[in-house]
């Protein structure tokens, strides 16, 4: 893949029109945290038919699994069945949509991306049929919003080794205690996927088994903290979660077994990290695109010493570097799309490298955009300062 297809461009242009009509007029309220993002992402899904597509997809998946379990047939291997390849055929349109939105508000992307790509996806890959039936239909249409809770105050990059949130067996149930922080959708989530260590008396606390549970808001002992005030991404509520003897029945343990066939919670999370880090590259591309567009327009409109500033070599060099960054990140995204079409995914190491380069490139481009705008770049009305704040979050986000 070396360029966007005609279908991708149609999706991009349709998304651009939606943004101009439905999001830009409310951007100040969203970015200040005054407006909730959830009505906007639900409107987006409704407008593009994504809610209907999600409902149909989950219905078909559940019907297939019911039939398979009734006949006791083994599920097909994802790679041999071509599932990834089928996804890849449509992924470029999704990337076109997301990158366009990223140039305006990566917080909105994070809001639905975490709910679907991490919360619902974990239930989909690790849950039993009954668990999928219980939670996925409402999550896949955004009727309900999910959070995905791994990070803790003392366990960020060392997410599993330093994890202190734990469960201990209490009869047939589990009691959950601990704290999570920096949790996207945490303050408002209806459903929360929580990773916790099993306190089984093992002396090596770092190596204890990690289990994955699903909680619903309002459960006794669960406290969802208020949204943090952040440097950027204010359109995505982020907060803390507190667990004080939250009683969890066995049907809330994903897979309903402590010995999951796909490994423990560590393996589940690592699989999600690949998608999350590639997603950072897509958002980085959107920020770079928007910075470049704004800077080119400004360089044509702004005059100094009787000349458009775009005629000065220093400005031309800045714009050229932005274009190089755009090409590099776009090529990484395109390469990933090609691999997906071929039925493969990047390794965790490759996804991490893509994430590191693209987020750093987006941050450098956005900071150069602020500098190119000069004093105006420091003012909120010109938007490049928001892009700089959002871009910096991508260097931290997703590890």
Write out the residue ranges for each language-model feature.
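Glycine-rich beta->alpha junctions and the first turn(s) of the following alpha-helix
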Residues: 2-4, 10-11, 86-88, 223-327, ...
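C-terminal helix-coil-helix/basic helical segment that borders enzyme active sites and/or dimer interfaces
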Residues: 24-32, 296, 300-307, 323-357, ...
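Internal helix-loop-helix
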Residues: 49-143, 185-191, 340, 389-392
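Short Gly/Pro-enriched turn/cap motifs at secondary-structure boundaries
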Residues: 86, 154-158, 182-185, 204, ...
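Glycine-rich phosphate/cofactor-binding loops in nucleotide/flavin-utilizing enzymes
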Residues: 97, 118, 271, 373-399
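A short, Trp-centered hydrophobic/proline-enriched beta-strand micro-motif
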Residues: 142-151
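A structural signal for short hydrophobic beta-strand segments in well-ordered beta-sheet cores
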Residues: 165-168
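A short core secondary-structure module
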Residues: 173, 177-224
């Amino acid at each position: 893949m070396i360029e966007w297809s005609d279908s991708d461009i149609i999706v991009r242009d349709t998304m651009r029109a939606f943004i101009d009509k439905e999001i830009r007029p409310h951007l100040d309220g969203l970015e200040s945290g005054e407006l909730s993002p959830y009505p906007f992402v639900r409107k987006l899904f409704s407008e593009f038919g994504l809610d209907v597509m999600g409902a149909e997809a989950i219905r078909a998946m559940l019907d297939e699994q019911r039939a398979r379990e009734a006949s006791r047939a083994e599920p097909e291997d994802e790679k041999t069945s071509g599932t990834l390849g089928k996804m890849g055929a449509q992924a470029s349109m999704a990337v076109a949509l997301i990158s366009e939105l990223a140039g305006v508000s990566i917080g909105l992307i994070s809001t639905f991306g975490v709910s679907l790509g991490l919360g619902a996806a974990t239930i989909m890959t690790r849950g039993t049929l009954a668990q999928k039936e219980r939670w996925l239909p409402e999550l896949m249409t955004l009727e309900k919003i999910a959070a995905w809770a791994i990070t803790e105050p003392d366990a960020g990059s060392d997410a599993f080794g330093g994890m202190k949130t734990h469960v201990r067996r209490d009869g047939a149930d589990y009691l959950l205690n601990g704290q999570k922080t920096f949790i996207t959708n945490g303050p408002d989530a209806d459903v929360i996927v929580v990773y916790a260590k099993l306190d089984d008396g093992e002396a090596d606390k770092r190596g204890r088994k990690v289990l994955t549970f699903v909680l619903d808001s309002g459960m006794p002992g669960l406290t969802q903290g208020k949204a943090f005030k952040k440097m950027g991404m204010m359109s995505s509520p982020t907060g803390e979660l507190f667990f004080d003897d939250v009683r969890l029945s066995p049907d809330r343990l994903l897979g309903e077994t402590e010995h999951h066939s796909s490994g423990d919670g560590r393996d589940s999370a690592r699989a999600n990290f690949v998608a999350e880090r590639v997603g950072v590259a897509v958002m980085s591309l959107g920020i770079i695109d928007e910075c470049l567009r704004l800077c080119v327009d400004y360089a044509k409109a702004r005059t100094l010493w009787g000349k458009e500033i775009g005629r000065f070599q220093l400005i031309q060099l800045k714009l050229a570097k932005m274009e190089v960054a755009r090409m590099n990140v776009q090529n990484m995204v395109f390469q990933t799309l090609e691999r997906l079409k071929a039925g493969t995914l990047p390794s965790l190491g490759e996804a991490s490298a893509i994430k590191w380069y693209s987020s750093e490139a987006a941050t450098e481009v956005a900071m150069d955009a602020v500098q190119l705008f000069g004093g105006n770049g420091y003012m909120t009305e010109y938007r490049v300062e928001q892009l700089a704040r959002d871009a910096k979050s991508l260097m931290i986000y997703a590890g």
